[in-house]
């Protein structure tokens, strides 16, 4: 099977979307299939040429230097698709290259599948061309794109419910991004001690993710301040970078916890895995995750998780078994963390259960589920994606739809 992946982000940019594409692609290749990625170039990061990766001219985004916006124009796209002989197109964005992929699927009569990775209306603050547009319009763009596809993949059942609630009529199937369990063998459990200012006596609270507004890291710092006041021998390690990093560092200084918070920046994949192995507890305050892949990774390393009860984490964390889900309340979040730090029996039980509970979402198993969907679509032969005409009372919405359609 020859699979065309159209995405608005790809390595060397780091995100859950990129990680998902990498994991599925690797598993597809291992099972004898071919994956071709159509994604952005990153002129400031100089990505190496890779076989099977076709990059579009891109413009660095002013507020996020590591992110680039692809220009969805290519005189060679049609000939490339015909030369490869794609069997299916899988898009990972309802914008730009995702739209280009949808047009290509319609033109070449290929089945079109879309993974809804992101609650797009929660991220409009990053994009000036839609930031003044209502969240309802951004939601509408995503809904109408879903309705152009043959099948929509949602990484959690709560996202399936959300898509149905906003009016998606296309068939929706729940397939999470799996966890590569083999990554978590033979790890360095003292890697943080060797490479950062982490004492062997400290309990390490770990966060992995983008340091952006949508990840709610400010909330986490306030909670950690309260935890540290009661349990001084603990440290918070933040793995990742993002537009809020300088603000968060300043906040740590103002709160008097800068000596207890470690910022690692972006790390190579293997070092991220070592961070999981070196930590004691995974803390995740985001309320905008469709899945929260990092939670599954933390559980694969045997870390109990404390997260906010919202969308993806609400399904990924088994409350009371391998971690705690709390309301968006500092006191509840702090109490859950302290319960695990101060109760060794509870911690040990949840740590063992964490690994057991993640085994059912291995990357190999999830990839096979996705391949079954591909096969079903290809065999149906009635998959021609349809073009939607967008009609909105909102003038800005009309303009955006006409531009992006």
Model-derived regions, located:
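Short alpha-helical donor nucleotide-sugar binding micro-motif in glycosyltransferases
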Residues: 81, 146, 266-267, 274-279
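Conserved donor-binding/catalytic core segment of Leloir-type glycosyltransferases
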Residues: 198-224
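Conserved acidic donor-binding segment of nucleotide-sugar-dependent glycosyltransferases
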Residues: 319-320, 324-330, 339-345
């Amino acid at each position: 099977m020859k699979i065309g992946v159209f995405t608005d982000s790809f390595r060397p940019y780091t995100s859950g979307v990129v990680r998902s594409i990498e994991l599925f692609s690797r598993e597809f290749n291992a099972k004898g299939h071919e994956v071709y990625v159509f994604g952005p170039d990153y002129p400031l990061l100089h990505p190496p040429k890779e076989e099977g990766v076709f990059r579009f001219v891109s413009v660095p985004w002013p507020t996020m230097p590591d992110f680039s916006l692809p220009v969805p124009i290519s005189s060679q796209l049609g000939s490339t698709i015909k030369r490869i002989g794609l069997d299916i197109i899988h898009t990972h964005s309802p914008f730009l290259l995702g739209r280009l992929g949808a047009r290509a699927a319609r033109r070449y009569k290929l089945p079109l599948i879309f993974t809804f990775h992101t609650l797009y209306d929660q991220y409009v603050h990053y994009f000036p061309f839609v930031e003044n547009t209502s969240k309802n319009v951004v939601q509408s763009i995503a809904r109408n794109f879903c309705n152009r596809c043959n099948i929509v993949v949602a990484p959690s059942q709560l996202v399936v419910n959300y898509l149905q609630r906003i009016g998606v009529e296309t068939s929706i199937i729940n397939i999470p991004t799996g966890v590569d369990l083999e990554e978590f063998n033979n790890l360095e459990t003292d890697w943080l001690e060797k490479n950062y200012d982490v004492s062997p006596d400290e309990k390490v609270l770990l966060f992995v993710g983008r340091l952006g507004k949508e990840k709610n890291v400010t909330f986490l710092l306030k909670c950690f301040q309260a935890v540290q006041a009661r349990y001084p021998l603990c440290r918070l390690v933040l793995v990742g970078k993002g537009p809020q990093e300088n603000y968060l560092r300043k906040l740590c200084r103002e709160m008097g916890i800068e000596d207890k918070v470690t910022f690692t920046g972006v790390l190579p994949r293997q070092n991220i895995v070592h961070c999981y192995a070196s930590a004691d507890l995974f803390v995740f305050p985001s309320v905008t995750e469709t899945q929260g892949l990092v939670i599954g990774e933390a559980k694969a390393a045997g870390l109990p998780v404390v997260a906010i009860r919202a969308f993806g984490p609400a399904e990924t964390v088994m409350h009371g078994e391998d971690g705690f889900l709390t309301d968006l309340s500092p006191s509840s979040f702090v109490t859950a963390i302290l319960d695990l730090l101060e109760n060794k029996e509870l911690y040990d039980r949840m740590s063992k259960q964490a690994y057991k509970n993640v085994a059912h979402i291995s990357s190999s198993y999830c990839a096979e589920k996705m391949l079954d969907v591909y096969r079903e679509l290809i065999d149906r032969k009635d998959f021609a994606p349809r073009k939607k005409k967008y009609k909105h009372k909102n003038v800005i919405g009309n303009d955006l739809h006409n531009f992006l359609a």
